[in-house]
Design a protein with these regions (language model features):
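Catalytic core of pol beta-like nucleotidyltransferases
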Residues: 1-37, 45-51, 60-109
Length: 109
């Protein structure tokens, strides 16, 4: 199971253009702030990203304000993050986009 998860993670990183170090930082912060689910969406989930494309993340549960602030400050990247708090009001069109193309990259068990 762990090997399969590692293969899936490597495939996700390659398809999304997110470096492994940055991905590990994102997951570490998700655990720190007790995020329940983290969903990658947008161009990096679809695979049509460009080098300067932002990283779109939908966040469910946990301490969203601190997670969002820390990820901007602590993540070792010049890329921008676009974060959506799924526990707050979200436009229906955006929710549809997240459910349609989103990839769950972290889920608290």
């Amino acid at each position: 199971m762990k090997l399969q998860a590692n293969i899936q993670t490597e495939a996700l990183l390659e398809a999304s253009g997110i470096k492994k170090e940055l991905f590990c930082q994102i997951l570490s912060l998700a655990r720190k702030y007790r995020v329940e689910r983290l969903i990658l969406f947008g161009s990096r989930a679809r695979g049509d990203w460009r080098a300067a494309s932002d990283i779109d993340l939908a966040v469910s549960g946990g301490d969203f304000p601190r997670f969002a602030l820390d990820i901007e400050e602590a993540a070792n990247t010049l890329l921008k993050f676009d974060m959506v708090n799924l526990n707050g009001p979200v436009q229906e069109e955006l929710l549809d986009q997240i459910w349609k193309e989103g990839i769950v990259v972290y889920e608290k068990i």
